[in-house]
Swiss-Prot record:
Binding, [4Fe-4S] cluster: 71, 75, 78
EC number from the UniProt entry: 5.4.99.58
Start and end residues of each Radical SAM core domain: 57-279
GO MF annotation terms: 4 iron, 4 sulfur cluster binding; isomerase activity; metal ion binding; transferase activity; transferase activity, transferring alkyl or aryl (other than methyl) groups
InterPro entries attached to this UniProt entry: Aldolase_TIM (IPR013785), Elp3/MiaA/NifB-like_rSAM (IPR006638), HydE/PylB-like (IPR034422), Pyrrolys_PylB (IPR023891), rSAM (IPR007197)
Species name: Methanosarcina acetivorans (strain ATCC 35395 / DSM 2834 / JCM 12185 / C2A)
Gene: pylB
Identification of the protein by name: 3-methylornithine synthase
Cross-referenced Pfam families: Radical_SAM
Function (record text): Catalyzes the isomerization of L-lysine to (3R)-3-methyl-D-ornithine via a radical-based mechanism. Is required for the biosynthesis of pyrrolysine.
Listed PROSITE patterns: RADICAL_SAM
């Protein structure tokens, strides 16, 4: 559908999306099948046009605090699965408080509090709620929580104490693939937890993996599945094999690239937040993701931080170019800039 379009046709296509045009499954198949660089650049062009209509050259910045890498789950793709014999950490309350002090006035729009499904917090969930309240009191910024499949009562308490956003990724809506990835975890339970959070006034984020055994049809199923959540943020991440996991040696020559899917997400979810994560390729990767239609930079770490990300391409590097100053400098070089905080809170509506 995009292959033979000239620039004026691409502009019209972007306008159709802005006016409310919904892509059919056949449209998605055509877009997911694009391969040549010329075709993909056309797709990215339309995605940027749609994004710029709603957000201009302004970008949002999300600080990532992975405060516990302990987890009770056995996700086949995840470095932190409970069977992997790795060094782990759990920040103390005081360490988290000190991290917050270092973040004051840095320019972040939102703080993402992320953990594995750590039994320390799952057995005493009020500990988690108290952390949310402390970070909210320290920084006064919107808070995203990424704690896994928390019980409804704890989600309600966290909401009351200042949490605004709830992130819980389905990874795939292909149930057969899901069972291989999230071993022993309920597909419906995960979906219903996210729906409950939405009903209680949270903004929600959903996400999928690519390059992990998904084909075009399962990717369409996932895109449609995310749509059914009415999400506020949608993401896709490339699967990166992790040492010590069941999928450590998994290799796939997939043409379903993260950048392609980011652009398609922008056409399906024109007003949504779509992340450009630093977790896989750092700031250079951020540039490519923004050029594909993303509008929020995630996995920014506090300056000089030794905290983990999720996939950590830079785990063994001495210098980790993932602080907010480095991000802003590169944004300025792209002709982009951080949005005012008030604009982010208008986008949130939660």
């Amino acid at each position: 559908m995009i292959k033979k379009m000239a620039t004026e046709d691409l502009d019209r296509f972007g306008e159709k999306i802005i006016e409310g045009f919904q892509l059919s499954d056949d449209d998605l198949r055509a877009l997911l099948s694009l391969e040549s660089e010329e075709e993909l650049e056309k797709l990215y062009y339309v995605a940027r046009k749609v994004r710029n209509h709603y957000f201009g050259n302004r970008v949002f910045l999300n600080c990532f605090i992975y405060f516990s890498t302990y987890c009770k789950n056995q996700c086949a793709f995840c470095y932190y699965n409970c069977k992997n014999e790795i060094n782990r950490y759990r920040l103390s309350r005081e360490e988290i408080k000190e991290t917050c002090k270092a973040l004051k006035g840095a320019g972040f729009h939102m703080i993402d509090l992320t953990m594995g499904e750590d039994p320390y917090y799952y057995e005493e969930p009020d500990r988690f709620v108290e952390l949310v309240q402390m970070v909210k009191n320290e920084l006064g910024l919107p808070i995203m929580i990424s704690p896994g499949v928390m019980d409804n009562a704890t989600l309600l308490k966290a909401r009351e104490k200042g949490a605004n956003f709830f992130a819980l990724y389905q990874e795939t809506y292909d149930q057969e693939l899901y069972e291989k990835l999230r071993v022993g975890q309920s597909f419906k339970g995960r979906y219903n937890t996210r729906r409950f959070a939405k009903e209680q006034g949270y903004c929600i984020e959903d996400g999928i993996l690519t390059g992990v055994g998904n084909d075009i049809e399962s990717t369409i199923k996932s895109l449609r599945g995310m749509k059914s959540n009415d999400p506020d943020m949608v993401r896709v991440m490339t699967f990166l094999p992790q040492e010590g996991t069941p999928l450590e040696r998994f290799k796939e020559n997939s043409n379903l690239s993260e950048l392609k899917i980011i652009a398609i997400l922008r056409l399906i979810f024109p007003k949504c937040l779509i992340p450009a994560s630093l977790d896989l390729e750092g700031i250079d990767g951020m540039v490519h993701r923004l050029n594909a239609g993303a509008n929020i930079v995630t996995s920014i770490l506090p300056s000089d931080s030794k905290l983990e990300g999720v996939a950590n391409y830079d785990r063994d590097l001495e210098e980790r170019d993932r602080d907010i100053k480095s991000v802003i400098k590169r944004l300025e070089g792209m002709g982009m800039e951080p949005a005012p905080q008030a604009e982010f809170e208008t986008v949130l509506r939660c």
